[in-house]
Structure formats: structure tokens, C-alpha cells
Swiss-Prot record:
Gene3D superfamilies: Ribosomal protein L17. One of its GO terms (molecular function) is structural constituent of ribosome. Part of the 50S ribosomal subunit. Contacts protein L32. One of its GO terms (cellular component) is cytosolic large ribosomal subunit. One of its GO terms (biological process) is translation. The keyword rRNA processing does not apply. The keyword Signal does not apply. It comes from Thermodesulfovibrio yellowstonii (strain ATCC 51303 / DSM 11347 / YP87). This is Large ribosomal subunit protein bL17. It comes from the Bacteria. Belongs to the bacterial ribosomal protein bL17 family.
């Protein structure tokens, strides 16, 4: 029976699970858009929303909490100085999960995890076309 068993375990030990989520969080903050499975995306979404809220507070205690989740101080700086200020007028829902189908090898449901205000970087060819016009 699975009574009172909640949360996502991903078939891993607690340390492995923590390392997985820290890595995904770091990638999300570094690239602002990642592709992963739906279950992992939903788990990281909760943590990312919480971290952006800490980033909006901006005090020392919030920075230290963010350091416990992120492996690199540069990522904490990016979170507090670049990402959190973009969401100053929003009260939650900073990250979205977009389902993209299934992986070919094992049919795992895939998703794109990105910040809500993510803008695709323009390609060089697009920039040249705009200059020509």
C-alpha cells in the first residue's frame, strides 16, 4: 500500500535525487531553457519558482538559501541580479513546462522547461535579413 507516500523519488536515493535536481536547476538558470522529462521538469519547476522568490527578496539569508540549492556562486549572482528583477511585477509562476512529445528510445514523455519571459536568441541569418530590409 502507498498510503501517505508523496513526492517524486525518480528511483534514486536521496543524495542522488538532490544532485539531479541541483544539476537541473543550475542548467535552467544558466541557459534559461532546458529539455528534460515531464516528471523532472515538474519537480524542478517547484524549486525554481521558490528560488526566484528568494531572488526577489534579495537579502543575505535568501542568498545563502539559494547557495544551498545551486552549485556555483556565479549562478546565484545571475539569479539575483538578472533573473529575479525581470519578475518584480509577477507573484509566482515564473517557470513554464511545455510538453513536447515522447523520447524515441524509451517513450518517456519529454518537456521543455523555461522561464516565462524567455525570448529565443536570434540567429545570425535572421539579423542579416533584418539589416537588409
Amino acid at each position: 500500500m502507498r498510503h501517505r507516500v508523496s513526492g517524486r523519488h525518480f528511483g534514486r536515493t536521496a543524495n542522488q535525487r538532490k544532485a539531479l535536481l541541483r544539476g537541473l536547476l543550475a542548467s535552467l538558470i544558466k541557459y534559461e531553457r532546458i529539455e528534460t522529462t515531464v516528471a523532472k521538469a515538474k519537480a524542478v519547476k517547484e524549486l525554481a519558482d521558490r528560488l526566484v522568490t528568494f531572488g526577489k527578496k534579495g537579502d543575505l539569508h535568501s542568498r545563502r538559501i539559494a547557495l544551498s540549492y545551486l552549485p556555483d556562486r556565479e549562478l546565484v549572482k545571475k539569479l539575483f541580479n538578472e533573473i529575479a528583477p525581470r519578475f518584480s511585477d509577477r507573484n509566482g509562476g515564473y517557470v513554464r513546462v511545455i510538453k513536447t512529445g515522447f523520447r524515441i528510445k524509451d517513450s518517456a514523455p519529454k518537456a521543455i522547461l523555461e522561464f516565462v519571459d524567455y525570448a529565443k536568441p536570434e540567429k545570425e541569418s535572421d539579423k542579416e535579413e533584418k539589416k537588409a530590409n
